C-alpha cells in the first residue's frame, strides 16, 4: 500500500513538472520584465506560459509535450525570438544593444541544427540556381569551373543528419509542399493526401498556411471550388484538423480577396451542426462582426489614446467614422498618412472623424510618427499580438472600416483615396 502511495505521489509530481524548459539570457538593458512563450497552431501563435526575469535569465517551464515552432515575446520592448522545440530544453543567449537584438546564439543542439539547416536551405533556394546558370557559361574545366562544380556539389549533397531530431526531419521531409514554387510538379491530389495523412506536427510546423496557398495556386478559377471541396471532404470537418484547415482557408480567401470563396465557405462554417474548435469559431465570429452592415465591436481606448476625451470607440460622436489599422513600420501606411492629413479638416467640417489604431510595439517610434497627427490615435504597443488582429480580423495594414453614426460598417475601402472618392 505504501509503495502504491509513493508511486502515485511521484507520478503526480511528474505530471505537474515541466516537460522542458526554455532558458534565455539577455542584458537588463534589453528587458527586465516578463517574457511570454507561444506555441504554434496553424498560422496562429498561442500564448502558453510566461516567466519573470531572475539573475539575468528567463526560465520558462513548458508544461506539455510539444514539438514544433515556438516564439518568445518580450512585452517591454515588443521584440520576439523564434525557435523550435523537440520536447527538450532550449538555451538561448541574446546579444543586444538597448532594445535591439544584434545576435541570437542557440546553445541547444536542436536549434543549432535547425539554424544550420535553414542556412543550407536558403543557399539551395537562392544561390544554387544562379550557380547552375553560371556553370553553363564556364563549362571549360578551368580553375573557376572546377570551383563552381565544387560549390554546386557541396550544396546539392549537403544533407543534415536528422535521426535524433523528429521535428527537423518532419520539416525537411515536407518543406517542399510549402516551397512556393508554382512550377512544381506536386499535384493537388498529392497536397490533399499530405493534409489528410501528415503527422501531428503539421499544425505546429509553420508549413500549413503556405502549403494551403501553394495548393490553391495549383487550381484555376474553374476548379478552385471543386478542389477545396475535395480537400475538406478528405480532412473531415468533424476533426480538429479539418476545422483548422477551414479556418486557415477563410483567412487566405480574405487576404487574397477571393470574395466568392470566402462567402461560400464562410456560409459552410457558419452552418456546421456540430461543435467547432477555437480558431474556426474565432474567424467565423470576426468575419461576421466585420461584414458590411454589421455593427463594429466596441473598443475601450488605452492610456495611450490621444486627441479625444472619449473612453470608447462608441463614445466618439460623428456622422461617420473612418477606423484605420496601421503600423509605423508599414510603408504603405506611411504613404497614406499625408493624404489623411491633407483632407482631415475638410472631413471634420462634414462631421467625419478618423480613429487610428497602430499595431506598433516600439513606443518611441509610435510617438514620433503620431506626434503631429490631429486625429484620434491609440495603440496597445503589442504589435501583431494586439487584440485588434483577432477582434477586427486585421490580416494586413492598412485596413479601413467606415462606420455610420451608429457604428454600422458601411464601407471597407482598400485605401483612403477610395474613401474620399465616395464623398465627391
Language-model regions, residue ranges each:
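Bacterial Sec-dependent N-terminal signal peptides
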Residues: 1-24, 424
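A non-transmembrane, solvent-exposed segment enriched in polar/low-complexity residues
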Residues: 19-193
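Helix-turn-helix repeat elements of alpha-solenoid scaffolds
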Residues: 146-152, 185, 218-226, 256-259
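N-terminal targeting signals for export/organelle localization
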Residues: 222-295
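N-terminal "domain-start" segment that seeds a small globular fold
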Residues: 274-314, 421-424
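Short active-site neighborhood of thiol/selenol oxidoreductases, capturing the structured segment around
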Residues: 311-340, 353-357
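Structural microenvironment flanking redox-active thiols in thiol-disulfide oxidoreductases
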Residues: 335-371, 384-388
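Thiol/disulfide oxidoreductase modules built on the thioredoxin-like
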Residues: 384-424
Amino acid at each position: 500500500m505504501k509503495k502504491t502511495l509513493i508511486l502515485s505521489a511521484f507520478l503526480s509530481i511528474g505530471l505537474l513538472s515541466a516537460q522542458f524548459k526554455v532558458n534565455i539570457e539577455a542584458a537588463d538593458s534589453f528587458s527586465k520584465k516578463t517574457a511570454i512563450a507561444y506555441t504554434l497552431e496553424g498560422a496562429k501563435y498561442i500564448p502558453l506560459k510566461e516567466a519573470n526575469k531572475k539573475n539575468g535569465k528567463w526560465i520558462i517551464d513548458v508544461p506539455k509535450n510539444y514539438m514544433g515552432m515556438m516564439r518568445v515575446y518580450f512585452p517591454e520592448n515588443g521584440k520576439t525570438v523564434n525557435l523550435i522545440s523537440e520536447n527538450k530544453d532550449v538555451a538561448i543567449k541574446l546579444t543586444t544593444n538597448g532594445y535591439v537584438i544584434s545576435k541570437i546564439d542557440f546553445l541547444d543542439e536542436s536549434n543549432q541544427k535547425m539554424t544550420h539547416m535553414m542556412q543550407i536551405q536558403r543557399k539551395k533556394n537562392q544561390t544554387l540556381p544562379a550557380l547552375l546558370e553560371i556553370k553553363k557559361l564556364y563549362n571549360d574545366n578551368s580553375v573557376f569551373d572546377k570551383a563552381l562544380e565544387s560549390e554546386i556539389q557541396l550544396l546539392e549533397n549537403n544533407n543534415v543528419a536528422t535521426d535524433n531530431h523528429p521535428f527537423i526531419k518532419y520539416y525537411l521531409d515536407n518543406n517542399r509542399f510549402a516551397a512556393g514554387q508554382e512550377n512544381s510538379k506536386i499535384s493537388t491530389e498529392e497536397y490533399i493526401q499530405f493534409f489528410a495523412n501528415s503527422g501531428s506536427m503539421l499544425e505546429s510546423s509553420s508549413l500549413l498556411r503556405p502549403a494551403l496557398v501553394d495548393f490553391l495556386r495549383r487550381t484555376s478559377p474553374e476548379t478552385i471550388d471543386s478542389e477545396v471541396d475535395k480537400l475538406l471532404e478528405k480532412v473531415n470537418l468533424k476533426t480538429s484538423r479539418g476545422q483548422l484547415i477551414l479556418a486557415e482557408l477563410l483567412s487566405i480567401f480574405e487576404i487574397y480577396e477571393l470574395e466568392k470563396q470566402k462567402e461560400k465557405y464562410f456560409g459552410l462554417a457558419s452552418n456546421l451542426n456540430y461543435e467547432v474548435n477555437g480558431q474556426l469559431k474565432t474567424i467565423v465570429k470576426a468575419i461576421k462582426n466585420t461584414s458590411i452592415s454589421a455593427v463594429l465591436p466596441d473598443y475601450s481606448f488605452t492610456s495611450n489614446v490621444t486627441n479625444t476625451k472619449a473612453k470608447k470607440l462608441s463614445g466618439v460622436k460623428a456622422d461617420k467614422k473612418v477606423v484605420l489599422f496601421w503600423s509605423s513600420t508599414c510603408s504603405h501606411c506611411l504613404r497614406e498618412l499625408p493624404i489623411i492629413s491633407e483632407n482631415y479638416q475638410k472631413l471634420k467640417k462634414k462631421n467625419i472623424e478618423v480613429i487610428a489604431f497602430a499595431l506598433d510595439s516600439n513606443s518611441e517610434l509610435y510617438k514620433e510618427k503620431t506626434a503631429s497627427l490631429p486625429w484620434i490615435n491609440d495603440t496597445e504597443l503589442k504589435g501583431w499580438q494586439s487584440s485588434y488582429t483577432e477582434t477586427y480580423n486585421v490580416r494586413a495594414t492598412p485596413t479601413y472600416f467606415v462606420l455610420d453614426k451608429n457604428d454600422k460598417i458601411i464601407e471597407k475601402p482598400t485605401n483612403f483615396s477610395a474613401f474620399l472618392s465616395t464623398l465627391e
